[in-house]
Amino acid sequence: MTSTKLIAILIASMFSLFSNHVIAENHKIDMLNKLGKERMIYSKKVISINVNDEITWKSVDKGHNVEFIGLPEGASKYKSKISKEAKYTFSKSGIYLYQCTPHKAMGMIGLVIVGDDKSNLDKIKKVRVYGKSKKILKSLLKGL
């Protein structure tokens, strides 16, 4: 193997490793008591991201958290502490349904679609939600 070919292979390998780290993004979602006319709400109800992207949920107003209640096969369950910033890196593609545990009946839910994979949509539709979350989830899923 010539030194030129070896250098080209090394550069291509380094670029490949570097580009995987550059592509991952950190998305921000605020946990709020009020946004416009809506109460007990995440600043984004639905977000589409890539595999290995991270979401940071910021507790702008106290008393909120993030709890996954529906997720793709093989994904890790997650529940953050109340009133604390939450971070999660999404390594599995699919739909994630999450809620604010204290405000689940008030409709404080959200969806993350990872990798444009909706293969677990039927599973998400079967997740039991309460109160106002029933109507909101139905509306969010209709929009997918």
Stretches found by the model and what they are:
Residues 9-15:
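Hydrophobic helical h-region of N-terminal Sec-dependent signal peptides
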Residues 22-144:
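Extracytoplasmic copper-binding redox domains, predominantly the cupredoxin/blue-copper superfamily
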